[in-house]
């Protein structure tokens, strides 16, 4: 049995989980999310927990078991606590600003790069740290990765956009001038 899939998902107070035929809807204090139902699994809700059990025991079902449990757990965590990713903008003259739902990045190009935030995400700036937050973990991570991709950190000086938890492996420059 899947080690992750067999764990029951605790449903905190104030969170409502509706298991439908096609989708599982989760409503909480921060909003509502939904995740598709896998037809290979059986969803059961009892005494403050949601448990996923496999109908068959083939390879595809085992693969889906842990995945669907994690997706549902992320929905419950999102509507209660929310998720956030912090990005650091490092470099001389590199700046970041948030204007409504548009992030303006000045990261060494001849023009400012504008990134529009999708609905449901919020961005805040403190100094050189940009924080993306929202209730959908997948959307928060995808948006942070898109912003990082605009100017990845380079290994010689470390300039660029990096995750706050990321460490950049630095390289030694050329040792020129020796004859």
Swiss-Prot record:
* Alphabetically ordered keywords of this record: Ribonucleoprotein, Ribosomal protein, RNA-binding, rRNA-binding
Q: Which GO terms describe its cellular component?
A: cytosolic large ribosomal subunit
Answer yes or no on keyword Lipid metabolism.
no
Domain of life assignment: Bacteria
GO BP, one annotated term: cytoplasmic translation
A GO MF annotation of the entry reads:
structural constituent of ribosome
User: What assembly does the database describe for this protein?
Assistant: Part of the 50S ribosomal subunit.
> Per the similarity annotation, which family is this?
Belongs to the universal ribosomal protein uL6 family.
What is the role of the protein in this entry?
This protein binds to the 23S rRNA, and is important in its secondary structure. It is located near the subunit interface in the base of the L7/L12 stalk, and near the tRNA binding site of the peptidyltransferase center.
Q: List the NCBIfam families hit by this protein, alphabetically.
A: L6_bact
Listed name of the protein: Large ribosomal subunit protein uL6
Q: What is the lineage of its organism?
A: Bacteria, Pseudomonadati, Thermodesulfobacteriota, Desulfovibrionia, Desulfovibrionales
The UniProt gene name for this protein comes to: rplF
